[in-house]
A protein has these predicted regions:
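Extracellular/periplasmic carbohydrate-active domains that bind, remodel
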Residues: 1-461
Length: 461
């Protein structure tokens, strides 16, 4: 078991893992939970275990009658997101839950952050008629790196486990669908990151990722880079090592992310525009991105919904709405925010909309908007941040977090964050009327509005 206070290991330049470290011979080799067991509609489901979480993928086309047995004593039980209104009936060690439609939620006992159960419900996805690569139920496939080509449709059947990574480069019309699992543990050491993306599509057009579970990858988990027309739907994305970002939308356009569950040990949903593996072709504008109806757990480190740090081209017309951030854990470094924009480069960031977002726990910061110079910087001239809109952001539990807005100043350059709008921000049901209510700290920022009233205009020196 990890010591999460002292042994969260980050190697900025990890030794390369040049080939898979192990071969899975059977689905039975994946560790199973001893704390939880789950049945749905009378059928027992497999509950997997990691040192950071347990999880069960529940696939059915009917209503869900769940029986979750918890085999260790506990005093307090929490089901998140609370917005789902799930009311459990507890009898003995068994928690009974009925769902009329598939939901993705957590079962947490006594506030434990590393032994929760993720219950990940989905409708069954049938095998598409145009399937070109099929992974069948009950089997393990050691693919190393699965390289796709144009018009590939990958089907991962419920109960199949694919061990390895998936890459696509300059492909059109590719899909990965199904209710099975892709496991990336073979590409990194047990307690460290590796210099390799998990599911990586570069310069692809018309990409669909739907239904499957991506768990324990070597670094960033789902990375559409310089892609157009991407849909990420109903995925379960879970990491347990540092730099284990959930989804990194990098230099891509016309992207939709919906109905996903993301638990990440770094940024959960992240927007970037930067060189990847020294490739300058992956620097491009990011626009027309919609992220909605997702459940997000940001474990240490990183941020839950992040723009940055590498924003080297224009970032505009993005919408984040109707999401539940159930945890944003304390980082103690530059990140640790539920919603953040970190501009370390020269791209202009504007017209970004956040609406109807519920935050159940933000241990460090709620909003964090900065222009800065840091170790991720590649462009010294800094881009502006302006016309940022927050509407109906609710903090539901926990301590009231601080928020920060800060521009950038040197003897030769000044870049101020401006025109940031906060409307209907509430802490435990209490509406914030002023920046003081929000615990908002500003520096080198102009024209900050709270409920339509300009509250901050700082003098230039």
């Amino acid at each position: 078991m990890k010591d999460f206070e002292n042994d969260l290991i980050y190697y900025p330049n990890p030794d390369p893992v040049k080939e898979p470290r192990f071969i899975l011979k059977s689905v039975d080799e994946l560790e199973k939970s001893t704390k939880y067991s789950v049945t749905c509609n009378g059928t027992e489901r497999v509950v997997y275990h990691t040192d950071s979480f347990d999880y069960v993928v529940v696939v059915d086309n009917e209503a869900y009658d769940l029986e979750i047995s918890i085999h260790t004593p506990y005093e307090k039980l929490e089901i998140r997101p609370s917005s789902f209104g799930i009311v459990p009936f507890v009898k003995g060690e068994t928690v009974h839950i009925h769902l009329d439609e598939p939901r993705k939620f957590t079962v947490e006992t006594d506030g434990g952050l590393h032994d929760a159960l993720f219950v990940l419900c989905s409708h069954r996805i049938e095998k598409p008629a145009d399937t070109t690569i099929c992974f069948e139920k009950g089997k393990v496939y050691n693919v190393g790196v699965l390289t796709l080509k144009s018009n590939d449709t990958v089907y991962i059947e419920e109960g199949a486990v694919v061990s390895g990574c998936v890459y696509a480069d300059h492909c059109d019309n590719i899909s990965i669908v199904g209710n099975g699992i892709i496991n990336g543990a073979c590409w990194h050491l047990p307690d460290s990151n590796a210099h390799r993306f998990f599911i990586y599509a570069k310069w692809c057009n018309n990409v669909l990722l739907k239904g499957f579970t991506a768990v324990d990858g070597p670094s960033w988990h789902v990375v559409p880079a310089a892609c157009d027309h991407v849909v990420i739907d109903d995925m379960n994305i879970m990491s347990r090592i540092v730099t284990g970002d959930g989804i990194d939308i990098t230099s891509s356009q016309d992207v939709e992310v919906k109905n996903c569950f993301i638990r990440s040990t770094d940024d959960s949903i992240c927007i970037k525009s930067q060189r990847l593996f020294e490739d300058p072709s992956t620097v491009r504008d990011v626009t027309k991105v919609r992220v909605h109806n997702n459940v997000i757990w940001n474990a240490e480190p990183g941020n839950a919904i992040e723009l940055g740090y590498a924003l080297q081209s224009e970032i505009h017309d993005l919408v984040f709405e109707d999401c539940d951030i159930i945890h944003c854990q304390y980082e103690g470094n530059m990140g640790g925010a539920a919603i953040s924009i970190h501009q370390a480069d020269g791209g202009h960031v504007h017209d970004i909309h956040y609406k109807n977002i519920r935050v159940e726990q933000a241990q460090q910061k709620l909003f964090d908007i900065k222009v800065l110079l840091c170790r991720y910087t590649e462009q010294l001239a800094k881009g502006e941040i302006n016309d940022i809109y927050f509407d109906n952001i609710q903090v539901l539990n926990g301590d009231i977090p601080v928020s920060m807005i800060r521009g950038y100043q040197t003897p030769t350059e000044e870049v101020r964050v401006h025109d940031v709008h906060f409307d209907n921000i509430t802490f435990m049901g209490n509406k914030c009327e002023t920046w003081q209510d929000m615990r908002l700290v500003t520096e080198l920022a102009n024209d900050i509005y709270v409920n339509g009233v300009r509250t901050c205009r700082q003098m230039k020196f």
